[in-house]
Design a protein with these regions (language model features):
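AMP-forming adenylation/ATP pyrophosphatase catalytic core
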Residues: 1-139
C-alpha cells in the first residue's frame, strides 16, 4: 500500500505504515553496501584524506542506527555544534524520512551523518585513510 504526499511543491509516493521500521541498529562488517529497512542504501569505500579515520575502527565497531533524538554533531571546529534534528530540518529531506535517517557511530559516539559530514573528532585528513559513507535514498 502506498500514499501520496506533498512537500515543497513536489509529490512523493511513499509506502504506508513505515512506523514498524523505526528503530534499527546494524553493525558494519566490511560490506561495500548495506540496504536499510526503509529501502535506502549506504555505500562504503576507503579514501585518502576523507571519511572516518580508520584508526578508530581498529578497536571499536561501526554501528548504523536511525536517529532517535538528542544527538549532536560538530563537523567543523569553527562552527557550533548542531542537533541532528535541526540539521535534517534545515535540509530538503522530507519530514517522514527524517526518523529513518541513518547516523553512524564508532562505539557509542556519533561519528558521521551520511551526506552531511564527519564529526571533527573522527575526520581523516591529509595522507590518512578513512571510510567514506554515502547514502542513496530510495525512490
Amino acid at each position: 500500500d502506498f500514499e501520496i504526499r506533498l512537500y515543497i511543491d513536489e509529490i512523493y509516493i511513499v509506502k504506508k505504515n513505515q512506523k514498524g521500521q523505526k528503530n534499527y541498529e546494524i553493525i558494519w562488517q566490511g560490506e561495500s553496501k548495506i540496504l536499510l529497512p526503509n529501502g535506502s542504501q549506504l555505500n562504503f569505500k576507503n579514501g585518502k584524506g576523507r571519511g572516518i579515520n580508520l584508526k578508530f575502527l581498529r578497536d571499536q565497531k561501526l554501528k548504523i542506527r536511525n536517529r532517535q533524538g538528542g544527538e549532536f554533531f560538530k563537523p567543523d571546529s569553527r562552527r557550533p555544534t548542531k542537533k541532528i534534528k535541526q540539521l535534517l530540518q534545515e535540509s530538503d529531506l522530507p519530514p517522514w524520512e527524517r526518523e529513518f535517517f541513518p547516523i553512524i557511530f564508532v562505539g557509542d559516539e556519533l561519528a558521521a551523518v551520511p551526506n552531511f559530514g564527519i564529526d571533527q573528532k573522527y575526520q581523516a585528513d591529509g595522507q590518512v585513510y578513512g571510510l567514506e559513507v554515502n547514502l542513496t535514498q530510495s525512490k
